[in-house]
Amino acid sequence: MNDLSNYRKSYEKSELLETNIPEDPINLFNRWFHEVEDFGGSGEVNAMTVSTIGLDGFPKSRVVLLKKFSEEGFIFYTNYNSEKGKAIEANPNVCLSFFWQEAERQVIIKGIAQKTSEIISDNYFDSRPDGSKLGAIVSHQSEVIPSRTFLEENLKKLEAEFEGKPIPRPENWGGYLVTPLQVEFWQGRPNRLHDRIRYTSQSDFSWTIERLSS
């Protein structure tokens, strides 16, 4: 067994105080997102973990890329027939989490996922490189396949079929908008006394703000 008990570090880069936060979590997320960009580092700042409850009753998490956020919520794109797509269809309650190690920050978002409009999905699909478009068509995500060669051969066929032609978005591929119900911001602090601020959505579209113990 590998003993990792000595793996630890002190978090000392910043703080999260009630006197310096907005009333709306999206505004704070926007601030943090761009501050993390300024920190630099090798990771993708828009990489997030999407957690769903599968048809087997077990939670499952995977990393996907956030493609847009606004007051309405958070948008990502995927194959609707994938394991995550089927899970969301059965149970739209999802959790998004961001861990920005270079800034010693984490954001956890609980919300409801629903498909974006076809126009939004079409517009994003049209912005993708042709190789990514064809990849979305050729890959029946989460299905068992005989080999990687199977995918590569099917991709070559599609490349020949669509050479010089527009590539349409497949109906089973598109976006999800996650409407946030609760957003927690975590800032690492010394001695494990981390700052945790939680926003919870109210029926009048306002947010309650609470500090949580670390």
Curated annotation (Swiss-Prot):
Substrate binds at residues 8-11, 67, 124, 128, 132, 192-194. Its EC number is 1.4.3.5. Pathway: Cofactor metabolism; pyridoxal 5'-phosphate salvage; pyridoxal 5'-phosphate from pyridoxamine 5'-phosphate: step 1/1; Cofactor metabolism; pyridoxal 5'-phosphate salvage; pyridoxal 5'-phosphate from pyridoxine 5'-phosphate: step 1/1. Binds 1 FMN per subunit. GO terms for biological process: pyridoxine biosynthetic process. It catalyses: pyridoxamine 5'-phosphate + O2 + H2O = pyridoxal 5'-phosphate + H2O2 + NH4(+); pyridoxine 5'-phosphate + O2 = pyridoxal 5'-phosphate + H2O2. FMN binds at residues 62-67, 77-78, 84, 106, 141-142, 186, 196. It is an enzyme of class 1 (oxidoreductase). InterPro entries: Pyridox_Oxase, Pyridox_Oxase_CS, Pyridox_Oxase_N, Pyridoxamine_oxidase_dimer_C, Split_barrel_FMN-bd. The keyword DNA repair does not apply. GO terms for molecular function: FMN binding; pyridoxamine phosphate oxidase activity. It holds the Pfam family PNPOx_N. Its cofactor is FMN. Keywords: Flavoprotein, FMN, Oxidoreductase, Pyridoxine biosynthesis. Homodimer. Belongs to the pyridoxamine 5'-phosphate oxidase family. PANTHER family: PYRIDOXINE-5'-PHOSPHATE OXIDASE, PYRIDOXINE-5-PHOSPHATE OXIDASE. Catalyzes the oxidation of either pyridoxine 5'-phosphate (PNP) or pyridoxamine 5'-phosphate (PMP) into pyridoxal 5'-phosphate (PLP). This is Pyridoxine/pyridoxamine 5'-phosphate oxidase. The gene is pdxH.
